[in-house]
Amino acid sequence: MATTSYRLVVAPAGSQRSSTGNVVVTTTSSGSHSSNGANGGTGGTSAGSSTLGSGLNVTTITATSGGQLQSAGNTSQSNGTTYKIEMLEEDIQSLGSDDDDEDLISSDGSLYEGDLGSMPVNDDVAHQLAAAGPVGVAAAAAIASSKKRKRPHCFETNPSVRKRQQNRLLRKLRAIIYEFTGRVGKQAVVLVATPGKPNTSYKVFGAKPLEDVLRNLKNIVMDELDNALAQQAPPPPQDDPSLFELPGLVIDGIPTPVEKMTQAQLRAFIPLMLKYSTGRGKPGWGRESTRPPWWPKELPWANVRMDARSEDDKQKISWTHALRKIVINCYKYHGREDLLPTFADDEDKVNALISQSGDEDEDMELSNPPTIHTVTTMTPPTGNSNQPQQVNVVKINSAGTVITTHTAQSNTPAPTIIQSTNNQHVTTTATLPASTKIEICQAPAQNQQHHQHHQTHLPNAVHIQPVAGGQPQTIQLTTASGTATATAVQTTAAAVSAAQAHAHSQSQAHSQSSANQTVTAQQIANAQVCIEPITLSDVDYTTQTVLSQNADGTVSLIQVDPNNPIITLPDGTTAQVQGVATLHQGEGGATIQTVQSLTDVNGHENMTVDLTETQDGQIYITTEDGQGYPVSVSNVISVPVSMYQSVMANVQQIQTNSDGTVCLAPMQVENGDQLETITMSPGMHQMMIQGGPGQEPQLVQVVSLKDATLLSKAMEAINSGNVKSEDTIIMEQ
């Protein structure tokens, strides 16, 4: 079963736009007209669909403000806005008549007559291809021959997309030719030839022995093809010595717009462009004397094969767009914009197909007609002021993207949404009135819940509110490919306001719950915490400390003995510490951080304080010889003073439960200037607590907790404020 993809374009058919009103969806075709609609009250909707002979399904939407349906052939009313929705089926399977099938086999050259000069004058793509060399001439001739059959296909100007289409169609051709030879029993082959040395390509597959015969005739076929193309090639342009010489943007023999060049193609093309622009063999990266005057000032003069910009600049503009700006600046500086290929947009291609639909053959049918989605615009009531005000809501779902527009004013024109698909990419352009609000967010995974949550859950939302009375703004969004649908939802202004108020109340409730989690020192001191006994004998508690989580999951308490400045880090290395950082509680309950050198602590001289903490969480400890040792801190937990005072007091009374856990009994410790010295039981290290100025220094060491999550859970339970007095909390692994 073949996969079918569609392209949906919604665009105003005329330049005049009226106020929001009823919408009539009609369908036109060459020789047939079908429409269906429904009326009710002051508004109505009419929709229809048909299949053109060219495989192009066109639906026209007309918005009227008088409550009447406007037919496609009635031109007496001009107060409506007409939109066209064109769905182009990519894989169109045609079933022609028996005479046409017979003509496909028996005709000798009837499909291709004339030369490139007989092509339409407005076919800019073919003329640019023909001027690019032998490969472009061959491509232009192939396009001209396909237009003899008036198929609704256009040349793909994007090289990446063109490559994917080539591989996909070659696989389809291979399957078709083998099916043809097997079902019909005829000698048939598919020959794909690309001229132009040295990149000559010659592929042939099909029924043998005809396939082998054509393989052996490769040289003869390619020579004849080159001669035939040389006769149809346009004359080479005259060289103008007044123009600066720059290379043309030609990728694999095909002129390619700079907007559609990939990053790899741009990186390979810019050095060649610099040779023409500067006249030097090498660019001279990094030297300001060799920097061209047209090089963008915001980009570093460095090799374009790597992005040497800062992280902030990388967030502003992608590297691919920066490379495209380099190319455009060079060609504009030398006055050679004529060498930048420009092709018609997708919307222009659609309009060209629509204009040619009346002259095309009606020998094609859509095997699977596409579904036409109706776009409805609700009209705000004008007669009864008690009715709720209607809000226009237009949503476009396209591969994980939702665009919602709200128009609260009744006299505001309806938004104009233009959606174009370029194979794997969908470009959405919304032209909106100045008072329209746009919300862009990621679409939810489940479509059935989208209507319930599209107003309250807006991750990565972008809100755009233009100034009232200003000019309409255009917002362009590019996403991954997907089936594009246009729908309309009836809602009221009160419903939109209620949804916004609900989201605001939820945010306030979350902030209030976070504020209620603050606990006092009395609550912390009266809490009882049970910790697994695996590391109690290794832990020395001090008035203040910083816990750092190691890469292996352990938590290290980095502490320093004033009598021995050499410490052992968790990774086994040693370092000399020149200062001790402590925290104490100052006036008003504020926590103050101080740094004392070991000279102030134990009277040693020639010691300086040099502790540096970088933004990425690393702490640098500098030794006497000036060598810095980085200490990686991936997670820092700050513990209040009152909590550590409570824990230190509780350490004196150790209780062992039946399950092997050790409980710390609650004990209240008053905050004072004088702090006592606590001596632990045998098996525990002696611990001294440093008090105010003049007191004995604290004894500190480097210890490690084996289970980082254990202590984190206990501290989280205490800080949550849910711990009651005399309760026991047992944290299990």
From Swiss-Prot:
Q: Which residues bind DNA?
A: 167-379
Q: Region Required for transcriptional activation: start and end of each range?
A: 375-663
Q: Where is this region: Disordered?
A: 13-51
Which keywords are on file for this protein? Activator, DNA-binding, Nucleus, Phosphoprotein, Transcription, Transcription regulation
- Example GO molecular function: DNA-binding transcription factor activity, RNA polymerase II-specific
Q: Which Pfam families match?
A: Nrf1_DNA-bind
Q: Does the keyword Transport apply?
A: no
A single GO cellular-component term from the record reads:
nucleus
Cross-referenced InterPro entries:
NRF1/Ewg (IPR039142), Nrf1_NLS/DNA-bd_dimer (IPR019525)
Q: Which residues carry this modification: Phosphoserine?
A: 97, 110
According to its UniProt entry, one GO biological process term is:
adult somatic muscle development
Where does the record place Low complexity bias?
18-37
Oligomer status and interactors? Homodimer. Binds DNA as a dimer.
Give the UniProt family note: Belongs to the NRF1/Ewg family.
Q: What does this protein do?
A: May function as a positive regulator of transcription in developing and differentiated neurons, regulating common aspects of neuronal differentiation and maintenance. Requirement in the CNS may be higher than in the peripheral system. Vital for development of the indirect flight muscles.
UniProt protein name: DNA-binding protein Ewg
